[in-house]
C-alpha cells in the first residue's frame, strides 16, 4: 500500500484559548457493486477517529502515534470489508500533539508544526475484474464542525451534546449542506508504519465514594490513575456539567496548584486545566466520553448536576495506557514492599502513552532521564520493547547538528538550552543497551549507533580544561530541597554518567562489529574516569566530591574506585547513611544506584529498611501518607511543594526487589542468554518471589523459610539459558557449597552463622 498523496483539513484555522475551533467531521461516500475486502492507510496531524459505515474501527485511542511531524509521521493500517452498494468513510479529527496550546510552557503553542488538524487516507480494494481502486483524501470529501467545541491534549474538552449530528458517518446521510474539505500542506517528516502498541482502555473503575461539597459532588476512585471519565446522565436541555480532575485534595476539593504552569497564564489556564465540560441535549440518557485528551487523577469534582443525578453510576473512570504485556512481577511477605511494587507498576503504565512520559497530569512529556532511569525495571516487568524502538527513532531525529539532544522527545525545539545534559541524554545509549540485555535486540543499537558516535564527539567539545563535564541537570529532586539543589556536584554526576555511557557504547559497538568506534568510546571512558579520580575523588579519605550518598554510591556503582579501594569507599557510604540516621538522602541519580550498591556489599537488610521505613524521607512514608503511585518529590508532610503525585523515575526499587530479594540478575555480563540467581535472605522476610518472561521463556525464583529455618529456593530457568546460583555470605547449599551452575529445581539452603 502506498502512502496517501494528499492531506486534507476543514480549514487552516486552528483552536486557541481565545478562539475555539470545533473538531471537524469529514466524510466520503462511495459506491461499489459487490462486497470486497479493502485496506486502509490513515494518519493525522492531531488525533483521528476512523469509522466505516457508522462503525468505529480505530485501533485504540489517541491515534496515531505521537510525534513531531517535521521528523516523523506515523500511519496506521486497517483491513475492512466493504458492502455492496454505498459505503461511507468517516473521520473525526482532534488537535492532538500538533496543536496543544496547553503545552505553552514548552513552546508547543509556537511550534513550527502547529496547525489545524488534518488527515491523509487511502482505501484500496480490487473489483471482480481484478482492477484496483483507491478512495483517497482529497477535495471531494465533505466536512462540518462537530459538537466538540474545544479539545486540548493536555487540558481537556468542551462538548455540546445539543450540536450532535445523528448519523453523520452512516450510509444515506445527506451531506449536501456540508462544505468541501481543502488540501493541507504535506508534513516533511519521514512516513512510517506505527509498530508501537496502541493506547486503549484497560480497566473501568467505579467511585469508592461520592461526597457533596459546596462546589459540587466529589467522586473518589480510590487510586491515582490516568485516562478519562465516562459520563452517563439523564440531563435537562442546556444543562452544563463540568468534570474537574485532580490527584489530591485541598480543603476537600481537587487542587491543581501542584501542577501549575506559567504563573502569568495561570488564571487563564485554570479555566481549562483538567476540565471536561458537557452540555446536555435533554432527550434521554446521554453518554459522553472524551475522545482526544486524557487526565491524571484520583478525584473528579462534578458540578452542574442535581443531588438525584449524583449517583455512583453517573461517572466511570476509564483507565488508559499503551497495551504493554505483563513480563514480570514480584511479591514477598512484607505488605509495604508489595504495595510499593504495585505503586511502581501503576506509575509505569499510567505514564506510558506510546512512550514513557514524566507524569499524566502536568506535562505528559517524554523526559529522557525519566525513561533512562526506569528502563531496566520497566523491561523487567512490561513488554515495552516495540514502543521503545519507535521512540528511539524520535530521539535520533531530534538530535541537532552539533550532536546535542533535547531534554524532552518529541519536542518543538524546547529542551536544548535547559533540561538536558548527560544524565538526561543517556537515554540514547541506555535504552539500546537494556534492549539488548533484556530482549536480545541489536537493531535498536544499530539504529542509534551513528547518533551515539555524534553525541560522544559532542561531549568532547563541552569538556573543561580538566576533561570534566558540567552541562546539564544533576541529581534531581533530593529530599526536602528544591529540585535543583543537589549535593553531588554537577561536574561529578555529568562526568561519571558520561563515562558510563562510553562504557556501554563500547559494548554495543563491539556487538555491532564497529572496532574503531568501540576503541574511541573506551578511550573516552578512561579519560573521564581519570578526570573524576584526579579532581573529584579524595584518595586519602576515599570520599567522592560532595560528601553525599549520591556521589559515593555512584562512584562505587560506576567503578570510579579501583577494586582495592572499594571496601574503604563503601565504609564511607555507610558513614554518610548513618549521618542521616539511616534515611535516604539522594536525588533520582543516586536513587537509581544506592540500593544496588548496598546489596553488592551484603547490606540488603539496610537497603530494605531504608526503602520501607514509615518515617520521612522514604518510600514507605509515601504509603503512610496515602500514596497509590510513586511521587515526584520527597517532601515533608505539610510542605508547600507537593509536585506530581504520579512519577515513575523513582521506580527502580522494583528492579532492586527482583534482583536483590528474589535474586534474578538478568544478563550479568551483558549477554541476554545468561541469568544469575543471587537472592538476599533478609531477616524481615519469610519469603520472596519474582518472575520475568525472557525471549527464551519464563525465568522465576522463589524462596521461603521452613519450620527448621532452612531456606527452600526454587528456580525456573529455560533450557537455552545458563548462569549460576550464588549465595550471599553466611549461606551454603546442603553440600556445603555456596555456588552452583543454575538449573531448574528446588534447593535447600542453610545458614552457617
Label the model's feature ranges.
Residues 111, 115-122, 133-167, 192-197, ...:
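Non-catalytic C-terminal accessory modules of carbohydrate-active enzymes
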Residues 39-42, 228-247, 292, 303, ...:
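Alpha-helical support elements that line or immediately flank enzyme active sites
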